[in-house]
Amino acid sequence: NQIDGKSAFYLYDTFGFPLELTVELAQEEGLTVDEEGFTQAMEQQKQKARDNQNFSAKLSSDSSLYEELDASITSEFVGYELLEMDEPTNPLDLERITALNDGSKWQKSLKEGEQGTLITAKTPFYATMGGQKGDFGTITTEKGRFEVQETVKLPGGRIGHIGRVTAGTLTEGETAALSVDTANRNNTCKNHTATHLLQEALREVLGDHVEQSGSYQDGERTRFDFSHGQAMTAEEIQKVEDIVNRKIEENLSVETKVMSLEEAKKTGAMALFGEKYGDT
């Protein structure tokens, strides 16, 4: 006779189904909803997110954790060519775990339930940078499975896969299969491209003074920060939406190219909001 709080929260968290609507529909069927249980599930999710965020921040900012690592331990991003490295037909397809950290010290292994960061010499996982949130997915060995909840750039140019062991044990030196959540990556890339479309549309409607002061993209949304002397009118917002949607409907091809900063500027690329760019 009652929809439990966890189920109600699952509808909200996974499908964006408001609690109020769940309650209303349940009442129509003579059911109730455990709203207290919903609130508890919500708080547990928030606490988990806070824990993961704090853990990620510690791993990515505490340079002392990496001073003892051998300088030969590096990471190469191969995610433009591969999203999975799990077929033993190519030298890039499988990688060895070169380092594991539990947030306080380097370990030889991590067991089920433990949080940590994994480093491999090559990875298809994109690390958070340039406003785009890093990939998540799985790293699997013969003896364990690791859920990658965040991917970050670490001191020394390394890429860290941060997450939790969900089954078995992962040990340094083991061969691992790396698999990016492709749906999330594709959605994130679409939202990143949409950010550029949005910027151009805003400049067309509001003027060339519009410059990006910040942005954020993940698999669910994009955010574009800019300065304008006044609030946009409903008509201006509609014009911007129409321009962006027309470009999306054109289904233009998107290419990824690596070039020098000078070459990029010649193609019309904009260096924005004091961003620190490297040579490529």
Spans of features found by a protein language model:
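A glycine- and charged-residue-rich anion-binding loop/surface
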Residues: N1-T280
